[in-house]
Amino acid sequence: LTSDEEIGMLGAQALDTSDITARRLINIDSETEGVLFVSCAGGVRAQCEIELGSRVASSKNVHTVYEITVGGLQGGHSGVEIHKQHANAIKVLGSLLTGIQRECDICVSDITGGGKENAIPKEATAFIAINSDESPAFVKKFREYTAILQQEYKAVEPDIAICLEKKDIAADIYSLEASKNIIYVLGQAIDGVCRMSTQIQGMVETS
């Protein structure tokens, strides 16, 4: 049943249930022969859609384009290792942009991060555009918030790397209002442990 579970439980989805009449399933899945689990795990897949409008080309005479990358993180399995509080690269990027946005107008071009649904993202990248006259203030705030985040995660992510690179290109960007919505969603997305078991010490119940 867990064939291809790393990318969406494809084995379970392909199961022919037409001859199954039972209403309950006992899970005995384990990676070690002779060992049975006494509990099981499940997940909910949510898809969030927001109206962003069309992107328009930035002007090299007006905007400066930057690439922000978050990397060097440990990542890990979002079920097995979620209690270790490893940093989520997408959330780190969201926190960074949220902080900077309080001081500078940011237009988002593209944001990518993560690869598997059940893995803690260890890399994320954003392409953004800033009004060129705000570039010095933007770079200053980037350094300030990067230092804050590195301090916050230094105990669990000693190799965290948050990098900024100026790109001599034009980019298709979302409006300022749409960009604020994108950054808001990144900042508000729930991440990490929500509840620990009250019956089994040290076991994550919900994350």
Where are these regions (language model features)?
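Alpha-helical metal-binding/catalytic segments enriched in His/Glu/Asp
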Residues: L1-G8, Y66-G72, H77, I82-I100, ...
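Acidic/histidine-rich catalytic neighborhood of metal-dependent amide-processing enzymes
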Residues: L1-V56, S109, Q201, E205
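Short beta-strand-to-loop capping motifs
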Residues: I50, V70, I128-S132, S207
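A structural signal for small-residue-enriched, beta-sheet-centric alpha/beta enzyme cores
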Residues: G76-G79, T112-P121
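Short Gly/Ser/Thr- and Asp/Glu-enriched loop/turn motifs at secondary-structure junctions
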Residues: I120-E123, E157-D159
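Extended amphipathic alpha-helical segments enriched in small hydrophobics
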Residues: K122-N131, S135-P136
